[in-house]
């Protein structure tokens, strides 16, 4: 669940991106898993979902420790960067540096799922 105010807009990186609605200071905890809001599926549970749900989630979910993590807010639109302005640390996505109001919020997909980054790089 995002812990900061954001909005979606056209991204110069890829399609739609997540942008900061206000300045975010360095070190701010920006996202964390919230059970009941975010959802983890075992691979067995994921495979039992209807095909349209699986196809949708392939674009917006992450593989983490052998499970599929699906989130429902703007965070699912965060784009990859080799030089992201966030870092994954102790279960939180944290501002690596101050993020300006209106700046796109980016993550390094390799911190979540190395396969995501490989798929992204093949699209270039």
Model-derived regions, located:
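Conserved catalytic SET/PR domain of SAM-dependent protein methyltransferases, capturing the structural core
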Residues: 1-124
């Amino acid at each position: 669940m995002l812990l900061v105010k954001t909005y979606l807009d056209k991204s110069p990186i890829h399609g739609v991106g997540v942008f900061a609605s206000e300045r975010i200071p360095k070190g701010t905890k920006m996202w964390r898993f919230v059970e009941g809001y975010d959802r983890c599926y075992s691979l067995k549970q994921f495979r039992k979902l209807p095909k349209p749900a699986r196809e949708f989630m392939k674009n917006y979910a992450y593989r983490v420790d052998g499970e599929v993590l699906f989130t429902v807010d703007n965070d699912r639109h965060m784009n990859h960067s080799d030089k992201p302005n966030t870092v994954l640390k102790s279960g939180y996505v944290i501002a690596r540096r101050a993020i300006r109001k209106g700046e796109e919020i980016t993550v390094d997909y390799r911190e979540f799922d190395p396969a995501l980054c490989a798929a992204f790089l093949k699209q270039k």
